[in-house]
């Protein structure tokens, strides 16, 4: 009644929302992926090494007709300079670092194995936080190291692997960013040092 008295229609439950996705134009991505894999059998056991690296050299979102119109409006002052983003040169902006790598080393002797691995990335920038000088906020490089130990045995005709491990060995926090979680949740893991036990039985 209060809505009608104010000349407004009462609101109710939203039954349908239409939000059409528009692919504004092409995105160009260039870079190099490299991988090094090496296994070595020795008198004391087997060593396995792996190193994978992804290096981006270009990540560019083309304007297209719609974005060009909006860009011209920003340059003329009709729209604020921060009205739209996510186009032009977006290399290392809001994710997609120039360099990401994964490195692991594993040693196995008989029924026992030890392993260590590391994930790392280079600096990325976010355009939601701009300094007075016009510079984007730099989200510093981040890397985490994990270690584990495996034991293999047979159980009722099946192969059992028992793993005890520690993730984020150095107990590092993800770098600060102005996202809803306080860090780039799509890029970094903010889980502190944690221990786990994993059992895998294969028949």
What are these regions (language model features)?
Residues 1-128:
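Gram-negative outer-membrane beta-barrel transporters
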Residues 28-32, 97-101, 141-145, 158, ...:
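Residues that define the transmembrane beta-barrel architecture of outer-membrane proteins
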Residues 42-44, 140, 155-157:
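A cross-taxa feature marking solvent-exposed loop/turn segments within ectodomains of secreted
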Residues 57-60, 117-129, 151-203:
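C-terminal beta-signal and adjacent terminal beta-strands/loops
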Residues 69-72, 133-136, 181-185:
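Short, low-complexity, polar/charged sequence segments that are solvent-exposed and flexible
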Residues 118, 127-145:
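Generic long, charged, amphipathic alpha-helical segments
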């Amino acid at each position: 009644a209060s809505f009608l008295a104010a000349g407004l229609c009462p609101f109710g439950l939203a039954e349908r929302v239409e939000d059409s996705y528009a692919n504004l134009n092409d995105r160009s991505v260039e870079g190099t992926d490299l991988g090094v894999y090496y296994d070595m059998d020795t008198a004391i056991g087997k060593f396995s090494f792996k190193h994978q690296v992804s290096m981006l050299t270009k990540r560019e979102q083309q304007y297209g007709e719609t974005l060009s119109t909006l860009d011209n409006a920003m340059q003329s002052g009709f729209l604020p300079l921060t009205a739209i983003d996510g186009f032009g040169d977006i290399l290392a902006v809001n994710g997609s670092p120039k360099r990401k790598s994964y490195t692991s080393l594993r040693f196995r002797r008989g029924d026992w194995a030890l392993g260590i691995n590391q994930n790392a990335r280079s600096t990325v920038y976010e355009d939601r936080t701009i300094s007075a000088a016009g510079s984007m906020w730099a989200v510093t490089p981040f890397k985490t190291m994990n270690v584990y130990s495996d034991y293999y045995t047979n159980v009722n005709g099946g192969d059992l692997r028992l793993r005890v491990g520690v993730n984020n060995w150095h107990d590092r926090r993800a770098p600060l960013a102005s996202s809803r979680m306080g860090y780039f949740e799509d890029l970094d893991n903010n889980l502190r040092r944690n221990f786990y036990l994993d059992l895998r039985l294969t028949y």
